[in-house]
Amino acid sequence: MENYFPSDQFSLEEYRLNNFDLRSLSDEQLAEHYKEYGKKEGRVISCIGNKQEFLNLLLGKTSLLEIGVFDAPSLDFLAQSGDTPLIHYGDYLGRDDLIARASQVGRNPHSVPEIRWVLADGYEQIDVDYDAVVSHHCVEHQPDLVAHLWDIKSILKSGGWYLFSIPHKNHCFDYFIQESTIVDVLTAYYLRYKKPSFKSVLEHRVFTSHSFRDGINPYNSEIPHMKNLFQLAFDEFCDNEYVDAHCWQFTPCSFQKIIQQLNAFELIPNINELKVYPAGVEFYVAIAFA
């Protein structure tokens, strides 16, 4: 099998190079540190340690689509490359709606790119076969992970790539929420979720924590007014066709395991290569489909 991507395995050299606080450790101490702490922390272990290094894998590709772009397109640097690739952007909303939303939530309306595909209208409309699709912090918002991967495969050339980043659940407001399991993914698939489940909306609205490093666990709360928050989350779920919420909570290891299982079960498009690169607060996933 051909290897398209750099290794995602633990490298002593890269671990030392990318973790400044560990540079004085011996090889033996580095290996022990990774085993005891670094793996759980999602520290950089390979030559792919930041978003730019990850996106550089796309150099030479000539047709690209970035989805879930909002006001932060990440492929503009490729437009200046000698290959002058075709670059399209897609989002659930159209450009005018994204500009309005950016103004409302304190984002940059001037950075919203031209939206070629409004994904609320489905992937069937897309009549371009791309070399690669890219997304950042988009996958965790997909109600049905299996269906999402089939959608992506449907707009790729044979052997096309899907490159994406996902927040590490232990480094964001999802800290106290349990990791998603294969059963969660299978439930969403067999029930054909088209929007986040009430469980996901409730977790996202009530049980996330932006002060998780202080150990304030919302799951331990006995505050009476929490009942009002539960009702608000339920009303939002019932009154809207779609709610923007995290449907999944992953670590690099848990995500890799679930994708490997789905591939073995033949529930997702056949994968030629899968690499997962930890990078601290997020991790990067490179998939080459058959």
Residue ranges and their predicted role:
Residues I48, I67-F70, L267-N270:
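Eukaryotic beta-rich interaction modules
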Residues M1-N50:
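Charge-rich, low-complexity intrinsically disordered regions
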Residues C47-K61:
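Class I SAM-dependent methyltransferase Rossmann-like catalytic core
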Residues G106-Y123, A147-K153, W161-F289:
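S-adenosyl-L-methionine-dependent methyltransferase catalytic module, highlighting the catalytic core
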Residues T62-I177, V285-A290:
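Conserved SAM-binding loop
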Residues Y4, H137, D244:
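Generic anion/oxyanion-binding catalytic loop in active/binding sites
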Residues F54-L58, F77-S81, K157, K275-P278:
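A general structural signal for short secondary-structure junctions and capping/turn motifs
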